[in-house]
């Protein structure tokens, strides 16, 4: 989870009309069937019979450690995959970078909007939130990491249908850990740092005042098309 996976955009025609013509959605991996989810996100370490029966005890002891990498997805992983995929697509559906409403949304600070309504209408967020609750150690983080690893973290765009789409990098996701001291300020600075690292730019100097820092982060999230 520490390495940032970057890919070049490969656009795929979408079946749903609300997703068509949107480079942010067309560049995402194709939706998997339930069987494909289970197959891709499972891992069963191969058993070497020679090591199992004839290797020295110390080697067999190390070999058993491979069981820690064993992954046998359950049905809740399928549901998590569907929820995350839907959240990504719905969020991007409202932010088609080729529409005038999105261009207005990107260029105005915070929730400001022009007096004249864009041709495609004012921007309306369709962002979703997902809550996963479970006992400590039940595998929530591992499950989410498995699902997120299916998606590239950065998609680089250069040409969409023969023209420059107006942006070059799309941050699909970032993982933020809550600070140990529960500081809102530290959390905000961590978000800003993660976005800088994902884009590949020098660390941005955080604003001193919390309100200004929040607006700084919001603007960075906008411009990077965070999923």
Regions from the language model: what does each represent?
Residues 81, 93-115, 121-125, 166-170, ...:
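Mid-core helix/loop region of P-loop NTP-binding domains shared across ATPases and GTPases
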Residues 150-162, 197-200:
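Post-Walker A helix-loop "phosphate-sensing" segment adjacent to the P-loop in P-loop NTPases
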Residues 136:
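The conserved Walker
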Residues 132:
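Hydrophobic anchor at the beta1->P-loop junction of P-loop NTPases
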Residues 140:
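Conserved lysine of the Walker
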Residues 155-179:
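Conserved catalytic segments around the Walker B and adjacent sensor/switch elements
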Residues 143, 147, 187:
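Hydrophobic positions on the alpha1 helix immediately C-terminal to the Walker A/P-loop
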Residues 1-125:
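A short, basic N-terminal segment
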């Amino acid at each position: 989870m520490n390495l940032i996976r970057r890919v070049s955009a490969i656009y795929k025609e979408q079946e749903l009309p609300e997703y068509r013509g949107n480079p942010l959605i067309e560049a995402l991996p194709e939706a998997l069937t339930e069987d494909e989810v289970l197959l891709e996100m499972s891992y069963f370490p191969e058993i070497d019979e020679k090591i199992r029966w004839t290797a020295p005890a110390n080697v067999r002891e190390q070999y058993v450690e491979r069981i820690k990498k064993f992954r046998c997805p359950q049905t809740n992983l399928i549901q998590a995959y569907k929820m995350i995929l839907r959240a990504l697509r719905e969020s991007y559906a409202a932010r088609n970078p080729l529409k005038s409403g999105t261009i207005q949304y990107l260029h105005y600070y915070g929730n400001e909007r022009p007096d004249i309504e864009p041709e495609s209408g004012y921007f309306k967020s369709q962002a979703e939130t997902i809550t996963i609750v479970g006992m400590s150690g039940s595998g929530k983080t591992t499950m989410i990491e498995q699902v997120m690893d299916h998606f590239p973290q950065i998609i680089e765009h250069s040409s969409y249908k023969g023209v420059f789409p107006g942006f070059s990098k799309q941050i699909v996701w970032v993982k933020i850990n809550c600070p140990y001291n529960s500081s809102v300020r530290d959390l905000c600075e961590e978000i800003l740092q993660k976005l800088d690292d994902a884009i590949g730019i020098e660390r941005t100097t955080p604003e001193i005042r919390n309100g200004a820092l929040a607006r700084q982060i919001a603007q960075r999230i906008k411009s990077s098309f965070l999923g």
